[in-house]
């Protein structure tokens, strides 16, 4: 952790409060997609949900995700070059002005040497820039309308899973300041930071954040892909990055890997359950629910008692 990051952390805790760091899984936690495609979401309702309809919705999402990945985020070029986070190759980026850079004509190939690592770093920087600007600059209005309708249809089919998960983020995060470090863009009154650690590839995961309206809360610096390194390694990076006694961590997901990683670091873990009668799903789980998990490991804080 460099001096600048250390100062940012000190700023966040300058009022003496604690900072809660939520480490989220994506599929079947903040969003539903895999369980729509394989039918497990609908099947959990024992016949009251149309499995075929869920599959149709999932396939529509897949189509849009892959198209935006390829058309706007260089995925055809870098699909086989997955990195755990966008800044992983920053040391190779010389800061070149990319406004007129021709990504189609730079002879990019597998980044086994410094030159191609620099070219991949350029692409990552361009992806980060597009991500922070959101969808409207590179998606035509007709497509935006289609995506808005698909979101509404999905939210209705899943009994408000998507909007409820987003409401959770709204309740405990209020982004007021733009920041390039993924830390100081959090309203200090909330003292919460949200980080995504997904088993999906990095570029499609960033696109999912955009399409499922999560990018307001998940800056590109806070999105990690664990495919090649595992969730425990990602969790360790996060712990090192936010290394301060006032920071508290909690992992939230539906899988065994994030559970094991959280246990290894002695973090609380909230298990998401698809079953309709579970309170550990969306709608259902709230910041107050998670505050009990924080308290069980770290003890009570003013932030816990203020959760509603």
Predicted region positions:
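HAD-like aspartate-dependent phosphatase fold
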Residues: 1-21, 26, 30-308
């Amino acid at each position: 952790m460099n001096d600048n990051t250390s100062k940012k952390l000190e700023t966040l805790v300058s009022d003496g409060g604690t900072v809660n760091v939520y480490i989220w899984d994506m599929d079947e936690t903040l969003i539903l997609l895999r369980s729509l495609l394989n039918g497990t979401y609908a099947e959990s309702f024992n016949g009251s949900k149309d499995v075929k309809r869920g599959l149709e919705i999932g396939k529509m999402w897949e189509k849009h995700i892959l198209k935006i990945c390829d058309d706007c985020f260089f995925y055809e070029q870098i699909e086989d070059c997955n990195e755990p986070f966008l800044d992983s190759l920053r040391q190779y980026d010389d800061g070149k002005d990319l406004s007129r850079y021709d990504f189609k004509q730079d002879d990019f190939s597998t980044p086994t040497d410094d030159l191609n690592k620099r070219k991949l770093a350029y692409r990552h920087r361009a992806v980060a820039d597009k991500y922070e600007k959101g969808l409207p600059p590179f998606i035509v209005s007709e497509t935006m309308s289609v995506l808005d309708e698909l979101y509404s249809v999905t939210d209705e089919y899943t009994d408000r899973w998507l909007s409820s998960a987003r409401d959770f983020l709204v309740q405990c995060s209020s982004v007021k300041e733009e920041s390039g470090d993924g830390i100081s863009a959090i309203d200090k009154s909330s003292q919460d930071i949200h980080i995504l650690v997904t088993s999906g590839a990095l570029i499609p995961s960033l696109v999912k954040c955009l399409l499922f309206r999560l990018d307001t809360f998940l800056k590109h610096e806070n999105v990690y892909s664990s495919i090649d390194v595992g969730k425990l390694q990602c969790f360790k990076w996060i712990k090192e990055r936010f290394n301060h006694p006032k920071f508290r961590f909690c992992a939230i997901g539906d899988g065994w890997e994030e559970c094991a990683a959280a246990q290894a670091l002695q973090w609380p873990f909230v298990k998401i359950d698809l079953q309709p009668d579970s309170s550990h799903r969306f709608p259902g789980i709230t910041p107050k629910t998670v505050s009990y998990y924080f308290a069980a490991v770290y003890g009570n804080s003013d932030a816990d008692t203020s959760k509603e």
